[in-house]
Regions:
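N-terminal carbohydrate-binding/catalytic regions of secreted carbohydrate-active enzymes
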Residues: 26-105
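N-terminal export signals
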Residues: 1-17
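Charged, low-complexity, intrinsically disordered terminal regions
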Residues: 17-42, 280-287, 318-320, 324, ...
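Extended ligand-binding clefts on enzyme/binding-domain cores
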Residues: 20, 48-51, 108-109, 129-320, ...
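Short, solvent-exposed positions on alpha-helices
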Residues: 68-71, 128, 132
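Aromatic-rich carbohydrate-recognition surfaces in CAZymes
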Residues: 50, 54, 101-125
């Protein structure tokens, strides 16, 4: 009898679903989501662009050796999102409006992935002109996006934004922003111990959260422990899907947060479906059979990742992107 994971990962693809190699996967993704000027488009968010997508696009272009697309994405990002007085980005760009940006606040995960992609471009691809910008962004993440943990003021929490709520009594925290490999590599490159400490403590907080009923998208950290966030609904949903991806990519597959999220995914009770969203009590809210989410399950369970096929290229931006990132993580970090 197959385990739950094995049953979910059995593809059953039709004959016309031809497998794609990594280069083909990248070209399909680029054709669907990257405009010629370098703007990465989220098709399910009214064709908006956001700092997360620009950061992911940079990372994927670098990983696939596509310098031209990398340059286009970075130039568009620099001209359209890097409007703040620091080195961080406004988080969202809305098309078909006179003022494309109506919220100048940043989203730290977008800045983190942009900085990491720029660092990798210089260090691994030899595109040296991007290193200084990577270091500048990393130092502003350190200076503006870290806050003391109210439970242990000597430890640092990664804030979801530079202006996010952070007081000695309550700090807003998004567990899915902890990409510890990126934080550590940027910390070493920038000679900034604060980023490395934030990576270490972030992994500790994720392990602590695995003792909660659900792994939350958002949570408040208080002197007495974890509490429902003031600005967001308490749930485990599409944000939290990234936690096992990032931990596995960072070589931390043994962190209990990985199995906590994957167990939730496998709780759907419907063949071939994943529970991609549950409420605070674990009640099912949304199911999906998208290959991108199945790839995260396979990565976290240390199984072989299903091949990406032509059928998968019809996915929307988010699962399509997570699928490519999961395969990249699998190539870069043998975590099991």
């Amino acid at each position: 009898m197959m385990s739950g994971a094995a049953a979910l990962l059995a593809t059953g693809l039709p004959a016309e679903a031809a497998p794609l190699d990594p280069g083909q996967c990248w070209r399909f993704w680029r054709a669907r989501f990257v405009q010629p000027d370098g703007r990465v488009v989220d098709d399910l968010q009214n064709a908006t662009s956001h700092s997360e997508g620009q950061g992911y696009g940079l990372l994927l272009a670098q990983a696939h050796g596509d310098e031209r697309t990398f340059r286009n994405i970075e130039e568009w990002t620099d001209h359209n999102l890097a409007i703040r007085q620091d080195n961080l980005m406004a988080w969202q760009w809305i098309p078909r409006r006179r003022d494309n940006i109506d919220d100048w606040h940043n989203a730290t995960d977008g800045d983190l992935f942009r900085a990491w992609a720029l660092l990798r471009a210089a260090r691994d691809s030899g595109w040296w002109e991007y290193r200084d910008k990577a270091i500048a962004i990393a130092r502003d993440i350190s200076a503006l996006c870290l806050a003391p943990d109210p439970r242990a003021p000597g430890e640092l929490l990664l804030k979801p934004g530079a202006e996010s709520r952070a007081t000695p009594e309550r700090v807003l925290f998004n567990p899915s922003y902890i990409m510890s490999r990126a934080l550590r590599e940027l910390g070493y490159a920038a000679d900034d111990d604060r980023l490395i400490r934030a990576a270490d403590h972030g992994e500790t907080v994720l392990a602590e959260l695995s003792r909660e009923s659900v792994m939350p998208d958002w949570i408040d950290v208080t002197p007495g422990g974890f509490d429902a966030p003031q600005e967001h609904e308490l749930r485990s949903s599409y944000d939290a899907l990234r936690i096992p991806l990032y931990l596995s990519w960072s070589g931390r597959n043994g962190n209990p947060a990985v199995s906590h999220v994957l167990d939730r995914l496998e709780s759907a009770g419907a063949p071939g479906k994943l529970a991609v969203s549950v409420d605070a009590a674990g009640g099912l809210r949304d199911l999906s059979d998208h290959a991108g989410y199945l790839a995260i399950l396979a990565l976290g369970r240390c199984g072989p990742l299903p091949e990406i096929t032509t059928q998968d290229t019809a996915q929307s931006y988010y699962p399509a992107t997570l699928q490519l990132l999961a395969h990249l993580a699998n190539r870069e970090q043998r975590h099991c």
